[in-house]
């Protein structure tokens, strides 16, 4: 996609995440939280629902800081000024388990990922951009799958692009079931 073009087309958008978003999204949220904390400590900050504040935010300047000053150190972003540093691929085992509280997911399909990437080189597909597969640690996968079993989850949908391309990893999961 054309990140800079999208930002020109939609000037109210501050930036676009590029690549995997879990870590980048968290860091962007942390920046917004720091700004909210600072705004709460400042008596000069306009009310959050005021037109003046909304216009200032659309321009990307908050508390006198530009978008680059606010977000330029966060890897994996496209800003109007250009791209920040590329984000390294995330170790899948470090990603948090999203289903510890199953209440919101009662009678729903659970989406679960044990790997990312693709070893193939299909020209039409984005899944093979880096031509490698990353696996979530099998002991973590088994622990999380056991949680689903203990919670009597009716359906888990594996969303791995190429679940069975690492035969050993896939067979470990099948044997576990």
Locate the predicted segments by residue.
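Short, solvent-exposed loop/turn segments at secondary-structure junctions
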Residues: 1, 21-24, 89-91, 119, ...
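Glycine-rich beta-alpha loop elements in corrinoid/cobalamin-binding modules
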Residues: 1-53, 57-86
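Generic intrinsically disordered, low-complexity segments enriched for polar/acidic and small residues
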Residues: 7, 22, 29, 50, ...
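Radical SAM enzyme [4Fe-4S]-AdoMet core and its adjacent flexible, acidic
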Residues: 8, 89, 173-174
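Pocket-edge positions in alpha/beta enzyme catalytic cores
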Residues: 17, 84-87, 131-133, 162
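Radical SAM [4Fe-4S] cluster-binding motif and immediate context
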Residues: 63, 96-177
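N-terminal [4Fe-4S]-dependent radical SAM core
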Residues: 71-114
